[in-house]
Amino acid sequence: MGPMVRQLVFVGLVGCILVVWNAHADHDVVVAQPRTPIVVTRIYTGPDGQTHAEQIDVKLTPGGGSGELSEMAAVTGLQFRRQAPNYFQDWHPAPRRQYVITLSGRGEIELAGGKKIPLGPGHILLAEDVAGKGHISRGVGSEDRISLFIPLAER
């Protein structure tokens, strides 16, 4: 076998090895991206007696093998609620400090000044406007809104 043939055989073998090795390599490698925060809409009574809103990112810390965890919140119970699509509740404060998580359906709350906050599936609301004028609650869309109330223990 001549030197040219040996060189072609060598190049062919190396090519085959690279193809086989590449076929078994992990191609799902992605560049690390920041994780999307868990966002809570907090409504609270301001010094003016009106309800205001802010977005809060939930602070998470490594939780061992179970992912990331927030601090444990002390709660007093849990309650489900179903509301008709056309529900309307005029100005009212929250009855207590509580999380309200929309599971299905849609609603919105309206604050003084006309600001509306949409409440869709997965939305987490922290209602702390227990004094003052409060907010308006209403249904949006054509299906019942199912939500979960999680009252917080007193601080």
Where are these regions (language model features)?
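Ligand-binding loop in jelly-roll beta-barrel domains
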Residues: 76, 114-116, 120-123, 129-155
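Bacterial N-terminal signal peptides
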Residues: 10-19
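Bacterial N-terminal signal peptides that target proteins for export
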Residues: 1-10
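Short, conserved beta-strand element in jelly-roll/cupin
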Residues: 92-109
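A short, N-terminal "cap"/entry segment at the start of jelly-roll beta-barrel domains
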Residues: 25-82
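Conserved short histidine dyad/triad with adjacent acidic residue
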Residues: 57-61, 76-94, 129-132, 154
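Short beta-strand segments in beta-sandwich/barrel cores
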Residues: 88-89, 106-110, 124, 155
